[in-house]
């Protein structure tokens, strides 16, 4: 019986037959015990199909014993098949525009929310739907990319009188930036340390005001954040102020007030609009003179998704004045849809190997396909938008591979840094080091070089806290190899234990932003600044370098009126073989149309930005600064050259200079060398004429 009990039961059989004829009629087959038949039903003979082979007892024991042996691996036949995750699959999404109804069709929900908050009217959408789609794709992609910091451009600023400066700029950051920690207005980087970059004071009499005060919604959000940051800023009340520009990722969620407003932000709207008066309680710090959305941005090129340029993670951006990372808000006023909720939409298809090389699990981003590609098809009255694809999520194995590659990359970068930095102890070369600022990416000191008595700025960065160290190398090399009187001077660098020390020229005059927001410049002074910047640009372009982030934040001034270009964290090195770029880099309000529309571009993007900066010197702010960033991008793409307020008050030479800079057709736009010969520059006054403006800006902010 034991042998009978060990036999497996017979497999189930059909109780009815599908066969025709009289052989099988009505009945079925009963299954009994372990044998066949076991009692037939009617006249139907038992099913004669053979049972499965009975397993051999010896084989069963061998398998059991083998499974208990430690370290033994099951044979290929015994193990479950390893089914991999799908790769290179695509989820296509088509967005169209119905010209009859004036509505977009098939638009992702996140895009719809973004567009709803963009202040782009229905008429404007109907006028140029392709421009709307272009900026939506770009904007969405920017918010999802995990940007990396331009580490040597941190606006580390402590404030005199709890003042806040315009948050300068530039690149993306995965940690709270120094600009955020201290609200610096500095545009310079280590590349240029500035003194006295602070915001407008309530007693400033010669402020160049332009633009409008933003709505109540902006003010309420700003007030809330200011209340959060007040305790930290109060601690810095009496500290000395120096800025080193922070490169920032631009996340378009800045809570802002008009850059030209010289009033403090306080607890209510009336205080925002009227003069400030002493309060019994400590007054809240003033808002930044420029909104956070004046930060720079960096996205991947259309044709290149190499891991080296895939930015690092970043939390949603905060206002310029937000002191701590936990004070950040997940969504912005200007563009609430720029929050992480957009990360669920379809994105570019990433190659598996590139995906594995990332340092993080890629989140979906919008596909960046040119309008002329195969996915841009026009059907009927609809404008088709490029398809989008979803990259597969990274598996644990992928993440492990990512971490391994990241570690190897860090080792290579550190080895490269060792070949760049100087050997020795900087503490012996520099004395009287005084801490003047601290932020997420490092601490800034002023020091005296013992041998020369020259004052320098030293930034100390903990390399373990820098997620994209290769950008540090890029910036150091560009600065070291491109020395010019109009470029902030890189002096030296050292590796001290786990820290990188970078020594830069110290410019105490502050950034040009302080001057344009605090004072009124005449054409002679504007021409002088333009000439100096053009000399720097002509030098860089001749050496195949595009700056890509020209704006007043990145122009530093000496007390003698010297003008120097800084912030090379996002510069591009071009070559005859690769003379064009498509990476979205810069700050939206200063961006050239070809950058906004994702066309290939070259050095002339810097000349467009110079033209916008010239308008900034006239009006106190760039065009469209009071617009939602998404709408500003739309207006740049649609209108091209912006309108200039009171243009008739400008000289004909200045008007022509602006026309040459702001020519939409790149081939017709003047080069830096051409503009250096322009008659407008003959109006330039001596650089010493800038000194009174610098001192006036300092005086205006002194009481803040």
UniProtKB/Swiss-Prot annotation:
Molecular function per GO:
ATP binding; protein serine/threonine kinase activity; SH3 domain binding; small GTPase binding
Write out the catalytic residues in the record: 549 (proton acceptor)
The listed outcome for residue 569 to D is: In Pak3; pharate adult lethal with some adult escapers that are uncoordinated and have crumpled wings, probably due to disruption of kinase activity
Annotated coiled-coil segments of the chain:
none
Gene Ontology CC = cell leading edge; cytoplasm; cytoskeleton; cytosol; focal adhesion; growth cone; lateral plasma membrane; muscle cell postsynaptic specialization
What happens on changing residue 9 to L?
Answer: Disruption of interaction with dock/dreadlocks. In Pak4; pharate adult lethal with some adult escapers that are uncoordinated and have crumpled wings
Basic residues compositional bias, start-end: 61-73
- For the region Autoregulatory region, what residue ranges are annotated? 80-171
Q: Which PROSITE patterns match?
A: CRIB, PROTEIN_KINASE_ATP, PROTEIN_KINASE_DOM, PROTEIN_KINASE_ST
Q: Where is the composition biased (Low complexity)?
A: 159-178, 255-266
Residue positions of motif PXXP motif (SH3-binding): 9-12
Chain positions covered by the region annotation Disordered: 1-87, 159-188, 254-292
Q: What is its EC number?
A: 2.7.11.1
Superkingdom of origin: Eukaryota
Top EC class per UniProt?
Answer: transferase
Instruction: Give start-end positions of Gly residues composition bias.
Output: 23-42
Q: Where is this region: Linker?
A: 97-429
Catalytic activity of the protein: L-seryl-[protein] + ATP = O-phospho-L-seryl-[protein] + ADP + H(+); L-threonyl-[protein] + ATP = O-phospho-L-threonyl-[protein] + ADP + H(+)
Q: Where does ATP bind?
A: 436-444, 459
Q: Which SMART domains match?
A: PBD, S_TKc
Outcome, altering residue 14 to M: Disruption of interaction with dock/dreadlocks
Task: Kindly provide the name given to this protein in its UniProt entry.
Answer: Serine/threonine-protein kinase Pak
- Species of provenance: Drosophila melanogaster
């Amino acid at each position: 019986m034991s042998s009978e009990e060990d036999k497996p039961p017979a497999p189930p059989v059909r109780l009815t037959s599908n066969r025709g004829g009289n052989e099988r009629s009505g009945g079925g087959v009963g299954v009994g015990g372990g044998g066949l038949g076991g009692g037939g039903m009617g006249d139907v003979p038992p099913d004669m199909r053979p049972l499965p082979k009975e397993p051999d007892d010896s084989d069963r024991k061998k398998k059991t014993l083998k499974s208990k042996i430690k370290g033994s691996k099951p044979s290929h036949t015994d193990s479950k098949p390893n089914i991999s995750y799908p790769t290179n699959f695509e989820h296509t999404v088509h967005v169209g525009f119905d010209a009859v109804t004036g509505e977009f069709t098939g638009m992702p929900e996140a895009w719809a929310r973004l567009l709803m908050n963009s202040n782009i009217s229905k008429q404007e959408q109907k006028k140029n739907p392709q421009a709307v789609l272009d900026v939506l794709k770009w904007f969405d992609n920017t918010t999802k990319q995990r940007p990396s910091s331009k580490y040597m451009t941190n606006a580390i600023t402590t404030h005199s009188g709890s003042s806040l400066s315009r948050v300068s700029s530039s690149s993306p950051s995965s940690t709270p930036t120094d600009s955020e920690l201290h609200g610096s207005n500095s545009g310079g980087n280590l590349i240029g340390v500035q003194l006295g970059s602070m915001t407008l004071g309530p007693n400033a009499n010669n402020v160049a005001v332009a633009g409008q005060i933003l709505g109540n919604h902006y003010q309420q959000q700003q007030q809330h954040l200011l209340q959060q940051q007040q305790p930290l800023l109060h601690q810095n009340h009496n500290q000395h102020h120096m800025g080193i520009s922070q490169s920032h990722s631009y996340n378009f969620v800045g809570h802002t007030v008009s850059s030209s407003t010289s009033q403090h932000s306080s607890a209510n709207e009336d205080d925002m609009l009227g003069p400030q008066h002493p309060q019994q309680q400590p007054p809240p710090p003033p808002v930044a003179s420029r909104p956070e959305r004046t930060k720079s941005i960096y996205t991947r090129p259309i044709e290149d998704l190499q891991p080296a340029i895939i930015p690092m993670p970043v939390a949603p951006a905060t206002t310029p004045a937000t002191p701590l990372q936990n004070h950040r808000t997940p969504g912005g006023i200007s563009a609430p849809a720029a929050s992480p909720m957009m990360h669920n939409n379809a994105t570019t298809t990433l190659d598996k190997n590139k995906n594995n090389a990332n340092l993080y699990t890629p989140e979906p981003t919008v596909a960046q396909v040119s309008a002329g590609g195969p996915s841009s098809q026009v059907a009927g009255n609809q404008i088709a938008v490029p398809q989008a694809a979803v990259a597969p999520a990274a598996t644990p194995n992928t993440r492990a591979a990512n971490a391994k590659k990241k570690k190897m990359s860090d080792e290579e970068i550190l080895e490269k840094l060792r070949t760049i930095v100087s050997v020795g102890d900087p503490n012996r070369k520099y004395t009287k080091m005084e801490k003047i600022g601290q932020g997420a990416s490092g601490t800034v000191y002023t020091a005296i070089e013992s041998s020369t008595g020259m004052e320098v700025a030293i930034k100390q960065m903990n390399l373990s806290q820098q997620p994209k160290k290769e950008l540090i190398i890029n910036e150091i090399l560009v600065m070291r190899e491109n020395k010019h009187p109009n470029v902030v001077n890189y002096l030296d660098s050292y590796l001290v234990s786990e820290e990188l020390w970078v020594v830069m020229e110290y410019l105490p005059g502050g950034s040009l932003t302080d001057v344009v927001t605090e004072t009124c410049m005449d054409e002679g002074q504007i021409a002088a600044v333009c000439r100096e910047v053009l000399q720097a640009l002509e030098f860089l372009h001749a050496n195949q370098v595009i700056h890509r982030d020209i704006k007043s934040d990145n122009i530093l001034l000496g007390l003698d009126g010297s003008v120097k270009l800084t912030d090379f964290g996002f510069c591009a090195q071009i070559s005859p073989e690769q003379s064009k770029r498509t990476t979205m880099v810069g700050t939206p309000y200063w961006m050239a149309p070809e950058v906004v529309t994702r066309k290939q571009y070259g050095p002339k993007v810097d000349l467009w930005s110079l033209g916008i900066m010239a308008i900034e010197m006239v009006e106190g702010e760039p065009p469209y600064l009071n617009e939602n960033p998404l709408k500003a991008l739309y207006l740049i793409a649609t209108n091209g050259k912006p309108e200039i307020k009171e243009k008739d008050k400008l000289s004909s030479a200045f008007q022509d200079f602006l026309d040459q800079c702001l020519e939409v057709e790149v081939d017709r736009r003047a080069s830096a060398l051409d503009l250096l010969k322009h008659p407008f520059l003959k109006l330039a006054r001596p650089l010493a004429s800038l000194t009174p403006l610098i001192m006036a800006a300092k005086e205006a902010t002194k009481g803040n």
